[in-house]
Amino acid sequence: MALWGGRFTQAADQRFKQFNDSLRFDYRLAEQDIVGSVAWSKALVTVGVLTAEEQAQLEEALNVLLEDVRARPQQILESDAEDIHSWVEGKLIDKVGQLGKKLHTGRSRNDQVATDLKLWCKDTVSELLTANRQLQSALVETAQNNQDAVMPGYTHLQRAQPVTFAHWCLAYVEMLARDESRLQDALKRLDVSPLGCGALAGTAYEIDREQLAGWLGFASATRNSLDSVSDRDHVLELLSAAAIGMVHLSRFAEDLIFFNTGEAGFVELSDRVTSGSSLMPQKKNPDALELIRGKCGRVQGALTGMMMTLKGLPLAYNKDMQEDKEGLFDALDTWLDCLHMAALVLDGIQVKRPRCQEAAQQGYANATELADYLVAKGVPFREAHHIVGEAVVEAIRQGKPLEDLPLSELQKFSLVIGEDVYPILSLQSCLDKRAAKGGVSPQQVAQAIAFAQARLG
């Protein structure tokens, strides 16, 4: 059933109808459309369009339809309706007859779809926040269990300084906490109702839009009808949050893919999140992580696509805005799936402490400690940096770690070096000295875990 046929003397070409119709994707707004229609029916009572009895009849029919949709959502796609609004209205008329045709009084699909989409966004943000916090909790638990797992930290993918696996986990907790904050901020800005703004100029009925917003669970009503029906900032904000969040998950995946290689060997992934090869029987591939990394690109694409769609649109509503949904639905679905999968990866991960320790002892990760030692002895840092560089070259030549060079060898580079240097060069000393806030010392890591646990509840 088309909602606009009176103006036209010819039927739409079937090819145009297929091109124009949006039911194949906006069916996902069915529940929100019905909830919005119930609230609108209440508003129509306040301005005398509906009687209380008529409203009750409409609300009952809409609630029955809501339960029917929840029980069998696939029925929507069996229809040839143009969009979800047409489908809901058609089903309502089937149930209550002519009364159903009164519901759209004073309402446009422009404010209707804007309301539906915001309601869907609110519901989905709630799911994303839950999944985000679950992954944070999984990371914190993994950190708590691996505070003593010393491993090399990297810059330029070269061993740099020793850290712990716990400290690595907590780095991603910080990223996810920022993602959580971005979602909460976006939620505040989208929590305003456009319903009652009509096509673009507002409704001719003196509806209390603040009351209507409250019935729908919004914090308030929007202030400008032109902006309200054409605003898709909330779509851009959520796509941006998803794009950033997926970058974080992609980096998380890349780190673990590397840690899981035979060359690194720091972790073993569970069989539950890996697959094999059809040819090579020895293979155990990190498919879950590779897919997280790969899916990052489609989310970035959705954000870029939506920005390009909106950038040249004049006020107010344009059919281009129908393109807001598919990318948004896919991007947020993808982000949600990847958050769940990342938590599943952590659920069965095994940290190989001996191999982590061995790798941390290689690569001269304690070179900075020797430089700091020289500074403490009064050597200017730039000179100390040069001295340690020369000592590392000699250690490499001899195939030894710095701490295995005899004192006589070390003193060739600086006479201030004494026997007290050797405790300084131990991995534990390297960790203990990083005791400033945010550092890798055991005390700081324990405090960071406690802080995260308290924040996450």
From Swiss-Prot:
<dbReference type="InterPro" id="IPR029419">
    <property type="entry name" value="Arg_succ_lyase_C"/>
</dbReference>
<keyword id="KW-0456">Lyase</keyword>
<dbReference type="InterPro" id="IPR000362">
    <property type="entry name" value="Fumarate_lyase_fam"/>
</dbReference>
<dbReference type="GO" id="GO:0004056">
    <property type="term" value="F:argininosuccinate lyase activity"/>
</dbReference>
<dbReference type="GO" id="GO:0006526">
    <property type="term" value="P:L-arginine biosynthetic process"/>
</dbReference>
<dbReference type="Pfam" id="PF00206">
    <property type="entry name" value="Lyase_1"/>
</dbReference>
<dbReference type="InterPro" id="IPR008948">
    <property type="entry name" value="L-Aspartase-like"/>
</dbReference>
<keyword id="KW-0055">Arginine biosynthesis</keyword>
<comment type="similarity">
    <text>Belongs to the lyase 1 family. Argininosuccinate lyase subfamily.</text>
</comment>
<comment type="pathway">
    <text>Amino-acid biosynthesis; L-arginine biosynthesis; L-arginine from L-ornithine and carbamoyl phosphate: step 3/3.</text>
</comment>
<dbReference type="GO" id="GO:0042450">
    <property type="term" value="P:arginine biosynthetic process via ornithine"/>
</dbReference>
<dbReference type="InterPro" id="IPR024083">
    <property type="entry name" value="Fumarase/histidase_N"/>
</dbReference>
<dbReference type="InterPro" id="IPR009049">
    <property type="entry name" value="Argininosuccinate_lyase"/>
</dbReference>
<dbReference type="GO" id="GO:0005829">
    <property type="term" value="C:cytosol"/>
</dbReference>
<dbReference type="Pfam" id="PF14698">
    <property type="entry name" value="ASL_C2"/>
</dbReference>
<keyword id="KW-0028">Amino-acid biosynthesis</keyword>
<protein>
    <recommendedName>
        <fullName>Argininosuccinate lyase</fullName>
        <ecNumber>4.3.2.1</ecNumber>
    </recommendedName>
</protein>
<dbReference type="InterPro" id="IPR022761">
    <property type="entry name" value="Fumarate_lyase_N"/>
</dbReference>
<dbReference type="InterPro" id="IPR020557">
    <property type="entry name" value="Fumarate_lyase_CS"/>
</dbReference>
<keyword id="KW-0963">Cytoplasm</keyword>
